[in-house]
Curated annotation (Swiss-Prot):
NCBIfam families: A_thal_Cys_rich. This is Placenta-specific gene 8 protein. Belongs to the cornifelin family. It comes from the Eukaryota. GO terms for molecular function: chromatin binding. InterPro entries: PLAC_motif_containing. Disulfide bonds: none annotated. GO terms for cellular component: nucleoplasm; nucleus. It comes from Mus musculus (Mouse).
Length: 112
């Protein structure tokens, strides 16, 4: 018995690449949001969990290279995994504070 040929009726959709953008604040721009800076300085773990929750991720990865890389690629922010590794290694508090400030600003612009 002959089999009928398989016909594909759906085509792959168009995926829009994220447009290039930059960080909303610099790495050491603590005074643009003192609340985030104080939270990161005195309760680093809490801020990391807030960032992870904002991104719908596990709270254990809020301060990792993977979280920063995911965020950077999601919003088309230039950089590399090596850059992300160096920032999170040598300045973890500044890294998480920058992520939180960026999330807050993008949320205020309805872009998060």
């Amino acid at each position: 018995m002959a089999q009928a040929p398989t016909v594909i009726v759906t085509q792959p959709g168009f995926v829009r690449a994220p447009q290039n953008s930059n960080w909303q604040t610099s790495l050491c721009d603590c005074f643009s949001d003192c609340g985030v800076c104080l939270c990161g300085t005195f309760c680093f773990t809490c801020l990391g969990c807030q960032v992870a929750a904002d991104m719908n991720e596990c709270c254990l990865c809020g301060t990792t290279v993977a979280m920063r890389t995911l965020y950077r690629t999601r919003y088309g922010i230039p950089g590399s995994i090596c850059d992300d590794y160096m920032v999170t290694l040598f300045c973890p508090v500044c890294s998480v504070c920058q992520l939180k400030r960026d999330i807050n600003r993008r949320r205020a612009m309805n872009a998060f």
